[in-house]
């Protein structure tokens, strides 16, 4: 096993590249391009019209640009010395590829993908040591009323103490009553206490875009999907002032 790729698609048929790794010994032989084309072909067959991803500056922004991806946003984590690029590609043409001689592409089992994840993690740590002990540290909060769950939020800190809000839900009967705000505040306080100087998220235009703007989040990117008459909006919020970031991130 000298490389691997993993991807997923959401309810709106938007593909997402979770990871791509090729053993350093076998790079620049076309394997990365073939793995990428293979997963793009599968996403297209599943009905995806677009695929997006994020990559750090020390990883593969040049590779993705060479393969038709377009940068639509980026975040500069100055305290960690890394930049995260956000890319998108339209899957509009038949996707073909030629497998290099002596190599084969197979569907991966869970154990194989776990090994790929470990290889990618080792490479990342070698290139840029983490600012936290674990790759990801999760935070979950629930809101209850009379013993019943009426809302919840899930987020995490990843790699370089980069905060991310994964999901937020409040029961319809309890919305516009401050429950969502309280849940977001609880998560932001936990991330700040952990040492995260920044938090970001993405939400659909019909979900929480106006809500996050009202809470002081700043928009740094947007993708429009005409086929579903909606947009995916990307928000960021700084949890500490610029002068505090390096200190907090290295707690």
Task: Walk through the language-model features, giving the residues of each.
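Acetyl-CoA-dependent GNAT
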Residues: 1-14, 18-19, 23, 58, ...
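Ordered, small/hydrophobic-rich secondary-structure cores
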Residues: 5-51, 59
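Helix-adjacent hinge/juxtasegments
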Residues: 23-33, 56, 165-181
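Conserved acetyl-CoA-binding loop-helix of GNAT-fold acetyltransferases
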Residues: 28-41, 66, 176-189, 214
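Short glycine/proline-centered loop/turn elements that form peptide/ligand docking sites
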Residues: 32, 36, 57-60, 77-83, ...
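Conserved GNAT acetyl-CoA-binding A-motif
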Residues: 43-57, 191-205
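Conserved catalytic-core motifs of GNAT/GCN5-like acyltransferases
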Residues: 52-54, 65, 70-86, 200-202, ...
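Conserved N-terminal entry element of GNAT/NAT acetyltransferase domains
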Residues: 89-110, 238-251
């Amino acid at each position: 096993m000298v490389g691997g790729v993993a991807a997923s698609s959401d309810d709106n048929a938007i593909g997402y590249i979770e990871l791509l790794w090729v053993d350093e010994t076998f790079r620049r032989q076309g394997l990365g391009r073939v793995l990428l084309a293979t997963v793009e072909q599968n996403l297209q067959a599943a009905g995806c019209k677009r695929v997006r991803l994020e990559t750090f500056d020390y990883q593969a922004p040049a590779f993705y640009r060479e393969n038709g991806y377009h940068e639509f946003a980026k975040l500069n984590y100055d305290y960690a010395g890394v930049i995260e690029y956000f890319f998108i590609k339209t899957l509009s043409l038949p996707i073909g590829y030629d497998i290099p001689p002596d190599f084969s592409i197979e569907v991966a089992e869970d154990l194989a993908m776990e090994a790929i994840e470990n290889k990618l993690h080792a490479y990342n740590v070698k290139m840029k040591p983490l600012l936290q002990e674990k790759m990801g540290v999760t935070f979950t909060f629930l809101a209850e009323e009379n013993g019943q769950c009426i809302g919840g939020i899930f987020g995490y800190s990843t790699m370089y103490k980069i905060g991310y809000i994964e999901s937020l839900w409040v029961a319809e009967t309890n919305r516009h009553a401050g429950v969502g705000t309280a849940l977001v505040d609880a998560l932001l306080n936990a991330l700040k206490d952990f040492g995260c100087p920044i938090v970001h998220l993405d939400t659909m235009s019909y979900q929480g875009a106006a809500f996050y703007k009202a809470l002081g989040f700043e928009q740094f990117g947007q993708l429009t999907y005409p086929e579903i008459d909606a947009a995916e909006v990307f928000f960021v919020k700084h949890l500490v002032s610029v002068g505090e970031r390096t200190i907090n991130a290295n707690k």
